[in-house]
Amino acid sequence: MAAVDSDVVSLPRGRFRCCLCDVTTANRPSLDAHLKGRKHRDLVQLRATRKAQGLRSVFVSGFPRDVGSAQLSEYFQTFGPVANIVMDKDKGVFAIVEMGDISAREAVLSQPKHSLGGHTLRVRPREQKEFQSPASKSPKGVDSNSHQLAQALAEAADVGAQMVKLVELRELSEAERQLRTLVVALMQEVFTEFFPGCVVHPFGSSVNSFDVHGCDLDLFLDLGDMEEPQPDPQTPKLPEASSLDSTLASSLDPQVLACTPASLDSLSPTSLQDSEALDFETPSSLAPQTPDSALGSDTVTSPQSLPPVSPLEEDRGEGKHRKELELAEASKDEKEEATAVLELVGSILRGCVPGVYRVQTVPSARRPVVKFCHRPSGLHGDISLSNRLALYNSRFLNLCSEMDSRVRPLVYTLRCWAQHNGLSGGGPLLNNYALTLLVIYFLQTRDPPVLPTVAQLTQRSGEGEQVEVDGWDCSFPKDASRLEPSTNVEPLSSLLAQFFSCVSCWDLSGSLLSLREGQALMVAGGLPSDLWEGLRLGPMNLQDPFDLSHNVAANVTSRVAKRLQSSCGAAASYCRSLQYQQRSSRGRDWGLLPLLQPSSPSSLLSAKLIPLPSAPFPQIITALVSVLREALGCHIEQGTKRRRSEGARSKDSPLGGANKRPRLSGQEKSCEEGKEEPQGCAGDHSENEVEEMVIELRETPQDWALLHCGPPGELPLMTAKCLDKTAEQNPMEPEGAGEGSPGETEKEASHPSSVSWRCALWHQIWQGRRRARRRFQQQTKEEGRGGPSTGAEWLAVEARVTQELKGPKSEQQRLQGEPLLTFVASASQAEQTLTVAPLQDPQGLFPGLHHFLQVFIPQALKNLLK
């Protein structure tokens, strides 16, 4: 038990944390259940196995690279049985030899000298490192120091201070920036030997002021005019081992300086392929990571239309066809030439840059690149030859961060939020560049604006700042001090809440979010041809600030776009709570912490919609509340009613001004107000729509269920009498019956179109539920009673099952401890679906709950509404 106790740490308010499994429990019973569970027992056994292996193992080095595990095994078997040998996969210069028992290991260590094939072996005991369980390892893209991050954020004074602290913890240190500068200088020195006059420009995260630990090093190799005579790449001398080489290699990795060929003659195609085969694993394992640049989209945009031909050639079909063939042939030649140069750059990286490995040319990308890894610095990077536009994208982002100090904290926070919710990354997800542009567009649409539009910046550019790249106007001031500061003084906490609220209701597919104009351009109405040339529309349309033919979110699928808006809606709902606005005096998570909790699996599950039965929406609302509160024992804190028609609102509607939740301080306008559409929501909302309402369930239950069966201020229980009354008030009618009836129109307009509940659970009421229900049914059968025949009887049975799972001291545990998890359940009348999204899930229980609700909710509503 002592070993188990050493893994457990006591937390405030009766909580416990298992450091071995990286799990936090709400109380002692939950801790005992965890310690007896399979996950904890398996990790305890794995730790014991690893410790025993370490005590039987030795570290061996000094043998040649051509020595294999079979030769080592044959040698060490002279001292005793050999259980396993692990070779160094990277360099092949060391091995871990696990002997069959401790006595064999002691025999190896007692030998004063070991030699194999004429080489002296260095043998020493294996270093005993602290066991790190797979559960405690951070998922890809998540900060490995999450606990330190959470502690630092919890100690901040307010949400704004949390956001500033997040920037300090995630940005590059000065030493990391200097290391990147050295790598760029090394690349510059090497490539200058082959391409005199070339310039290596860094762009992307390293220079756009949104850098994070471990971000890629994106480089643009500017070769100048390729048509000018270039020196013969076969004859130049190789760069000598300079101070840059020694700075990067000797201090970080003494074995990084490899022998380089005397000339590129030795870099034959065969040798290059062999080298690549040695450096690479599989192409799939080297999928490009999403950079913070225009390289982020893996999709290929539509090709530009051919230049217009003269009227004379239009009359000559043969001449036109010949012209097209000539252009196609010229384009093919240029592509082949660019590919050849790209391969040459890859060859130089492989053979002439110390410490570079895993070089891969990607000519098929939208912007062809050469990917590489630099062993001494641990950096991953890309080199592109035709991406000058990305330099100005990076400088534009840097200018935006200099214009207003709130830009960086907001971008860092939203990047971290999107990362933890599985919304950003590669493939169909948002890349960091697109997410950053989305934040800048949002800041352009505030009233007053936080940032100016790109068109306004172009007008304020000076004579020396007029730049055109690839036919696109990239003019903007270089010095932010020349620009007038924004008159917007809203705090960071308010801007973050507004972002979530606005994105949740923007029309992402029906409009084009333009940073140049600072407004949403409707897709249906058509745009000027110069804005549409080659633009590929999709479920999410976000225009590049300079290359107006590029949709930076073209790779985003409809599913990801819906999940983005759903997650923003859940986050906006949370930002209205006191838990977000005020620091907790009880030590519970507050402010940014619930938003930044790792929940990628949960967020993926929350995109799966739970279908609702065909019934009047008020009946469904009432039944859902009863299922959540009575059948499952959820503590329901609040509900949200979303947009509805103002003109059709009943005069007797209980939704008066007193029921509106006060707006956040400084949040004067949001996208729900419908005012100044270009400054707020991008969607084409009706003028009669009113702002979002937040109603406390205990204050206005009649508006939720449209029932008056219970006492005032209390949500009525789902009884047969209430169901009958609901059916009388809202009888089921065939689809289309009574269409256009004024009375029905008024009645339907008074109902909420979308309802949300914030729910909390203190017990895992979904685990063992089938077994508990089976026991109850057996007892009922033995007593001679039949099964439930009405919705009320079914509800009573499920409530009893829940109470049995919770235990006799459930109420005391609820008052003393924190909930296991909290989630938001949102019912939509238009889509007739229920969405469940996690808010707080420290133990990762939401996937199990969601799987249970997918089956339980439809069946429960069917039983209640039959």
From Swiss-Prot:
Residues 282-304 have a biased composition (Polar residues). Keywords: ATP-binding, Magnesium, Manganese, Metal-binding, mRNA processing, Nucleotide-binding, Nucleotidyltransferase, Nucleus, Phosphoprotein, RNA-binding, Transferase, Zinc, Zinc-finger. The modification Phosphoserine is found at residues 686, 741. Its EC number is 2.7.7.19, 2.7.7.52. GO terms for cellular component: cytosol; mRNA cleavage and polyadenylation specificity factor complex; nuclear speck; nucleolus; nucleoplasm. Residues 492-550 form the PAP-associated domain. Its main location: nucleus. GO terms for biological process: co-transcriptional mRNA 3'-end processing, cleavage and polyadenylation pathway; mRNA 3'-end processing; regulation of RNA metabolic process; RNA 3'-end processing; snRNA processing; U6 snRNA 3'-end processing. Residues 669-687 have a biased composition (Basic and acidic residues). Residues 116-147, 223-249, 267-321, 638-687, 728-755, 773-792 are annotated as: Disordered. Binds 1 divalent cation per subunit. Poly(A) polymerase that creates the 3'-poly(A) tail of specific pre-mRNAs. Localizes to nuclear speckles together with PIP5K1A and mediates polyadenylation of a select set of mRNAs, such as HMOX1. In addition to polyadenylation, it is also required for the 3'-end cleavage of pre-mRNAs: binds to the 3'UTR of targeted pre-mRNAs and promotes the recruitment and assembly of the CPSF complex on the 3'UTR of pre-mRNAs. In addition to adenylyltransferase activity, also has uridylyltransferase activity. This is Speckle targeted PIP5K1A-regulated poly(A) polymerase. The lineage of its organism: Eukaryota, Metazoa, Chordata, Craniata, Vertebrata.
